[in-house]
A protein has these predicted regions:
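Membrane-embedded alpha-helical bundles of multi-pass transporters/translocases
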Residues: 1-512
Length: 512
């Protein structure tokens, strides 16, 4: 298997989903703007999304995938199928309980996650109603992520990468055609979440059947391997929860700021999700099962080499994305979101949040490379300790930044916290000899810095001298102008890299 090809496949399919995600957010911004309705929906949608990351894509995947890789390497296919059935039964059992509790406790959940909403009765009640419709998404998407973890472990990377597209399609269809049929109209978005979750799960089932894993889940408390997964999940849940708790605390802080602050941070975060989703998710998707295989076979040289490959690709592609997001922040926000109810003031506030977020992009994506280095070795406690320390530091930064910088300070704290997290993980991997840097890092970094300066300077000069207008022009013209700038930035960066000796085959890596 060519890992670079697999990364390109996962990244391109994820890109399709992210582009549709921007289309969806543009449509939502045009229909609802940034105000009470969107604030309540984003809070209600954030909570099941948070639990999804904790139970499925976060803690569960960290605990499940390495043990599944161990079964693949050391056990028979029949034993692996039994293991998967038992894990599916346990996961379904937990998810039913969590979903039921979430629906019943919706008022308390909203009060804890956005206490500022309690001052406005209508806003508070609407948040509760939206949460009760969106909460079953946790059950659907967690099972979908479970299926995706199995497919990824068998190198069927494309199917799970394409699956999120269905949620965006559901959002787009409901926003365009069903809003008039709901009262209040924002309830259409909540039902779009539910339908999208159903579609994501159902789409993957035929491929699961081809692998022989589409069996009725079976609840077993006596399976030793399932108990190992549960034991690994305990610290993993704590670790993933720490990151999500940080986001919830930021929402709590933002709920006390002026109306629209939650939405400004949300839209800026959506722009950040393009590189984190395309590159970060793609790297994490490929690295965890592959590293787990090397850990199971105790091949330390291949393990370290794979981490080195991931870090180089991470820096090569993430740093220009961060520079681009910062330098092109205003063109990006106005082109994608500034229509109808989304005002120039909303665009400027979102721009400032995006610039602050961009400082942490390299940290966010490096975590996706470094953390699997621990998870694959079934060491979850170390990243948890790092995450807890980072949470404390992030909240101290929130307290320091919120008064002078408002919502921008909250965004900056998240970014700097991510960089701190990544730096500590890197230090610990080096300290324990798990990762040994390959040759040529100094020259690699110098060439990258030169290329980034050329790219950033070129984009800044282009915006200064080219007669581009971003406020009083139509969406198609803005999109055309933005494409010109993106093409210019990408061209400057990759031509500079080529001139300095970089070639695609330098990053090719083949795994069995």
């Amino acid at each position: 298997m060519n890992l670079l090809g697999a990364l390109a496949k996962v990244g391109s399919l994820t890109m399709v989903s992210r582009i549709l995600g921007f289309v969806r957010d543009t449509i939502i911004a045009r229909a609802f703007g940034a105000g009470m309705a969107t604030d309540t929906f984003f809070v209600a949608f954030k909570l099941p999304n948070l639990l999804r990351r904790v139970f499925a894509e976060g803690a569960f995947a960290q605990a499940f995938v390495p043990i599944l890789a161990e079964y693949k390497e050391t056990r028979s296919p029949e034993a692996t199928q039994v293991f998967v059935r038992h894990v599916a039964g346990m996961l379904s059992f937990v998810l039913v309980i969590v979903t039921a509790l979430g629906i019943l406790a919706a008022p308390w959940v909203i009060y804890v996650s956005a206490p500022g909403f309690a001052k406005e009765a209508d806003k508070f009640q609407l948040s509760i109603d939206l949460l009760r419709v969106t909460f079953p998404y946790i059950f659907l998407i967690s099972l979908s992520s479970f299926v995706g973890s199995i497919l990824n472990s068998y190198h069927k990377f494309g199917i799970p990468a394409f699956t999120p597209t269905f949620l965006n399609i559901s959002f787009i269809v409901f926003s365009l055609f069903f809003v008039p049929y709901f009262d209040p109209p924002v309830m259409a978005l909540a039902w779009a979440v539910f339908v999208g979750g159903v579609l994501q799960l159902v789409f993957q089932l035929p491929w699961l059947a081809k692998l022989g894993f589409l069996k009725m889940p079976k609840l077993s408390f006596k399976d030793a391997a399932v108990n190992r997964v549960l034991k690994q999940m305990a610290p993993a849940i704590l670790g993933v929860s720490v990151a999500q708790i940080s986001l919830v605390i930021n929402t709590i802080f933002a709920s006390f700021l002026q109306s629209g602050s939650v939405s400004w941070m949300y839209y800026a975060d959506r722009l950040m999700e393009l590189p984190t989703g395309v590159l970060g998710v793609a790297l994490g998707t490929i690295l965890l099962p592959t590293l787990s295989k090397h850990a199971a076979s105790q091949d330390t040289e291949q393990f370290s080499g794979l981490l080195d490959w991931g870090l180089r690709l991470c820096m090569l592609l993430t740093l220009p994305a961060a520079v681009g997001l910062a330098v092109l922040s205003f063109p990006l926000v106005t082109t994608l979101f500034m229509y109808r109810e989304f005002t120039l003031h909303d665009a400027q506030m979102t721009q400032y949040a995006l610039i602050a977020y961009s400082f942490g992009l390299i940290g966010l994506i490096m975590i996706k490379v470094l953390a699997p280095g621990f998870y694959a070795r079934q060491n979850i406690k170390t990243p948890v300790k790092v995450a807890i320390f980072t949470l404390i530091c992030t909240q101290l930064m929130n307290l320091a930044f919120i008064s002078p910088l408002k919502h921008v300070g909250l965004s900056l704290a998240i970014g700097l916290g991510a960089c701190l997290n990544a730096g500590l993980l890197f230090f610990l991997l080096r300290k324990h000899g798990i990762y040994r840097p390959g040759k040529g890092w100094a020259a690699f970094l110098v060439k990258m810095v030169i290329s980034l300066v050329v790219m950033g300077g070129g984009l800044w000069l282009a915006q200064y001298y080219l007669p581009f207008e971003w406020v009083h022009v139509g969406g198609f013209k803005k999109a055309g102008q933005l494409c010109v700038l993106i093409a210019l930035g990408g061209g400057l960066y990759f031509v500079s890299l080529a001139a300095l000796g970089f070639r695609p085959h330098h990053f090719r890596r083949v795994e069995k």
